Amino acid sequence: MEKHRARALGRDSKASRRKGLPSAPPAGPYELGEKRPKLHLNIRTLTDDMLDKFASIRIPKGSKKERPPLPQLKTVSGSSDYSSVSSETMENNPKSLSENEVLKLFEKMMEDMNLNEDKKAPLREKDFSIKKEMVMQYINTASKTGSLRSSRQISPQEFIHELKMGYTGERLFTYLESLRVSLTSNPVSWVQNFGHEGLGLLLDILEKLINGQIQEKVVKKTQHKVIQCLRALMNTQYGLERIMSDERSLSLLAKAMDPKQPSMMADVVKLLSAVCIVGEESILEEVLEALTSAGEERKIDRFFSIVEGLRHNSVQLQVACMQLINALVTSPDDLDFRLHLRNEFMRCGLKEILPNLKGIKNDGLDIQLKVFDEHKEEDLSEFSHRFEDIRAEFDEASDVYSVVWDTVKETRAEGHFVSILQHLLLIRNDRFIRQQYFKLIDECVSQIVLHRDGIDPDFTYRKRLDLDLSQFVDVCIDQAKLEEWEEKASEHCKKFEKECTDHQETQAQLQKKEAKINELQAELQAFKSQFGALPPGTKIPLQTSAKGEPGPSAFPPAPPALGAGVPPPPPPPPPPPPPLPGMAMPFGGPVPPPPPLGFLGGQNFIPLNLPFGLKPKKEFKPEISMRRLNWLKIGPNEMSENCFWIKVNENKYENKDLLCKLENTFCCLEKEKRDTNDFDEKKVIKKRMKELKFLDPKIAQNLSIFLSSFRVPYEKIRTMILEVDEAQLSESMIQNLMKHLPDEEQLKSLSQFRSDYNSLCEPEQFAVVMSNVKRLRPRLTAILFKLQFEEQVNNINPDIMAVSTACEEIKKSKSFSKLLELVLLMGNYMNAGSRNAQTFGFDLSSLCKLKDTKSADQKTTLLHFLVDVCEEKHPDILPFVDDLAHLDKASRVSVEMLEKSLKQMGRQLLQLEKNLETFPPPEDLHDKFVIKMSSFIITAKEHYGKLSTLLDNMTQLYQSVMSYYAVDTKKVSVEEFFNDLNNFRTSFMQALKENIRKREAAEKEKRARIAKERAEKERLERQQEKKRLLEMKTEGDETGVMDSLLEALQSGAAFRDRRKRTPKLKDIRQSLSPMSQRPVLKVCNHENQKMQLSEGSRPHHSINCTSTRTPVAKELNCNLDTHTSTGRIKAVEKEACNAESNRKKEMELLGSVSKSESVPEVEALLARLRAL
């Protein structure tokens, strides 16, 4: 209430002043200047009202500035001397504070001292008396420093409220000035309370002032005051972190650089310089992006404002701009990037300004120029050092390797170079893959190293390249294989087709000869039965065997004469053995069927005597119910003696582990509910498009279309047809001509108008010309057949060869036979107890049903299980996919269409032969039809005979194969047989790929999980190490951060750490661990570090809190950026014992710059901020 009354009183007095009325006298009976008595307040009032108004004990006495009064803000009424209040109260009534009040004050004290939780924990465990004593000492100390003596304590919320009001002009300027003083004098807790919301308000005000484009003096003053408030906020670690984390802050600071306002620009440039030296490389990128955006908006170079600041007469601004240039140029670790930034500054005009700057007498400017020149010389020396040893010839790989090795050995790059070589060794030993990998690596390295477009690369892109090269490499490998194997494959295919054709033709001729032999033998038997035996003593003019015995085709001896004492002739020889499947009997009879098995009527009844030596199949009894394999069963009565299923022995694949795995995978856990909707097949009805027909076709119009499409003179077309010119005649031309040509009667009628040729239209003229050719349509039919004959042969021959070769492959493949045996074993085990149990064989079309049999968990199929078993236990089965290579092509062949095509070819040959016999003699000199067609028909008959022989042989082969596997040719066509096998082969290969991908995915997931765990472990180790580095500072002071950074920039100490990125070769001897390519730390000579050249690989460095631990922090932080290792940390800690003496020597070298500066404290602060 008192506070509200005081504000109301202030408003009334101001209102009276505006109206010309005298203001109300001050409250109380005392006049102005009269001494007031001490105000005695209870300590409880201090506890309740002043918790947020403790002053920091870190601010020295007398350093505070009196704040200017805030308009329309009334402070706490009365001027209380809190020093006397607190001291008197503590002396008179030391036990006036309750336990809760003391604990609240104790927590507030620790918060105001910026203690973390780890440091607060031991203090909370102290006795209450100790806590109370600490609180009293804290209040007493704060009272003595005068921090509790101010009468104008304003809370952060009041400042935030006033900033939200949107005041402008002098009023806003007054608020900001008061805010700057409060941010400077109040404790960190006050700054934190204001920064949560106040920072965004300050940036909003700054953005409005920058974008307002108002050049009034008060606006510039206000803008400068906002910059000063930001600087005061950044003077704490909290404020610095907030500024660096806000996206707009750096962009607005870059836009606020105005050489016309030297004082404000100096403050802006200093803040950006501090951010550059304390932030990580990402902060540097953000600063450069902010400068680039500001330059683009103003349509100037991004560094133009900085260089213009150097042209100004203000030495303070010149020093600040040189500080920012040094911070930008020395921050990147990459040498090329540093050279790029420095050259960009030179192009903007720095080269012309440097001589003038060196003529100015100023110690601070001299320090910055010296830092700039030293870093420039070191970078140029390092750059020139790259090319010192490049004097060798690069034609030989050994010479190039020697040069590269001399360049990287005993440097930090050595580990990466060895890593590159090791990775090159990991390329798979395949000549196609190796070539494509090296080609890809060469292209990537070329694009990284060379910049042929004449401009610099995008140095702002600092992220890692994550490229998925597997698909690209696969494409390159496939392309290389195709290029190399294309010629070889075509040659081998031609040779193979020729050999197969010869082989098939030879077999066909052999079969013909055997048939001829059988025919002759039949005639011989008929002759013997008709004429009887020869008289005794007759010589048989037949060829005998080598031993003088008659050959197999010799006539038998004649029977003896009646009455002779000769024994009767021996009985006839036994019948010959049954022929092979597909072969005819000796006298042309078919193979007799096996005896009927009338006793095989029952399904579950096991016959006692099975045909062809079959033995009953083993009966399996699984412990649990199994899913069924729905195959088509083949009974013994459907098999022939040489059938495949007679000889199978699937028991050799029986394995306890296999059967247990099969049982666990395909067991029936519960009755599945099937959704009937899943079985509704959507039949796609293909609508047959009706062929379009001319409703009123006109011959003249058709001929016009034909003639316009070819544009050949009519006489020339006639000559081409008479000469049978295959070079100019084409199939489409002949077909269109036959289609649109008038019939013979119309042609004869048009021949009467030869005298009126010129008066006829073009189609009629063409018809008149063509009417002179005798028997035109038979000619065109024969020519078209001749043009298409070669294509027909080339189409029929490969199809016949594909089917024939596929039949041989199916029958001869041992791996395919083993696969069928394994499937038979698995099927009998799964079907145990059902009607399909104890099966002797199954129809090959059942193989396609393997992928339809799901496992118990619905995650795999029986086909995938079979593939997995073959991979693990029976790898000799997998080659069946290659054994049946021609199965794919054979599955696309229609045997019925082959037979029709061959019959059509035979009919065309007969028709052509009849036409040649009845063709009239030629009357025109150009008529060569009979001559060319007579020679063509001879060649065509020869090819037709070969194709007929090959087709007969193919028919016998597939009949033999289907009989071999007990396939009923009446129920299953050849196309269905090959399609089923090809679908199974394709599904098997697909399942094989899916199993491989599944294993690779599982392995990849495992590696990713291990890598993630390793990365998380390393991250935790890095966090613990950073936490340890943060706790190494003994004091809890978090204020004065920006003051220390600006001091470091001004003295040049902030840039010394950047000059020690990488020592010279002889100062740091790095070795490579035999088990890893990571560098192992060795002892560093920090005394000579400054005078040596740095290497191109520049890792981040940090400076530790104390001078004795500085080298340790540097090396440790370097390793934390890559891989944290216990061995490295131990090696670094061993180095710490000798670091103090080296650090003292280094301090002597640095003393010439500024003897009064506190270098360890500055570097410790930098190290701590970088660690954060």
Swiss-Prot record:
Subcellular localization, as worded in the UniProt entry: Cytoplasm; Nucleus
Gene3D superfamilies: 1.20.58.630, 6.10.30.30, Formin, diaphanous GTPase-binding domain, Formin, FH2 domain, Formin, FH3 diaphanous domain, Leucine-rich Repeat Variant
Pfam families per record: Drf_DAD (PF06345), Drf_FH3 (PF06367), Drf_GBD (PF06371), FH2 (PF02181)
Domain spans labelled DAD: 1037-1067
Superkingdom of the organism of origin: Eukaryota
Low complexity bias spans: 77-87
Cystine connections: none
Residues recorded as bearing Phosphoserine in the entry: S56, S155, S1073, S1158
Modified residues (Phosphothreonine): T47
MF (Gene Ontology): actin binding; cytoskeletal protein binding; microtubule binding; protein homodimerization activity; small GTPase binding
Residue ranges, annotated region (Disordered): 1-36, 57-96, 535-586
Motif Nuclear localization signal boundaries: 16-39
Residue ranges constituting the GBD/FH3 domain according to the UniProt record: 94-456
Family membership: Belongs to the formin homology family. Diaphanous subfamily.
Note on domains (UniProt): The DAD domain regulates activation via by an autoinhibitory interaction with the GBD/FH3 domain. This autoinhibition is released upon competitive binding of an activated GTPase. The release of DAD allows the FH2 domain to then nucleate and elongate nonbranched actin filaments.
Protein name as annotated: Protein diaphanous homolog 3
Organism (species): Rattus norvegicus (Rat)
Gene of this entry: Diaph3
